[in-house]
Amino acid sequence: KVYQANGVPRCLGLALTNLSACIHLFIMSLMLYVAAPLVFNAKTPENPGAYFFCLAVYMAVSLGVASVIGLAVKDPAKTPMLSIAVFLPSTILSGIMFPTALLPKGLAILGRMFPAFWGYGIMTDSTCQPEKLLPLLAMFILAVFACILLLGKTDT
């Protein structure tokens, strides 16, 4: 709304918001990448180049989904609630918080519909396997098309 009030095109507002979020997420990821081995005695990825590529792919998909939510929900007070409704189950059902083997089969299958499942899978592998990137690519393409459609709609 602030961008519209000042005459800034919605697509520029979307691009700037995503750029800012991407920079912040990357800085946080770098901090965790450095701190995790020191604080938690975690292993560093065997192939840092593949790890950061997979991180960039996962961030792009997550920001795409967040962009769809931001463009689709007209009431700013409802946007965080819908984001929580999408991203919290994504985290819970992906295997990040606990192994998916502990979930009932139906919930484990449902978890595969969320980006976090595939993002976690590619980031924990030592190599970035193309067959694990395809679902994320499909989600990203769907998010881009949804954003294009939502940007094309006029506000009423």
Describe the residue ranges of each PLM region.
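Transmembrane helix-loop junction
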Residues: 37, 70-71, 75, 95, ...
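A residue-level signal for alpha-helical anchor/packing sites in multi-pass solute transporters
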Residues: 2, 33-34, 68, 118, ...
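Alpha-helical transmembrane segments and their short interhelical loops
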Residues: 10-81, 88, 130-133
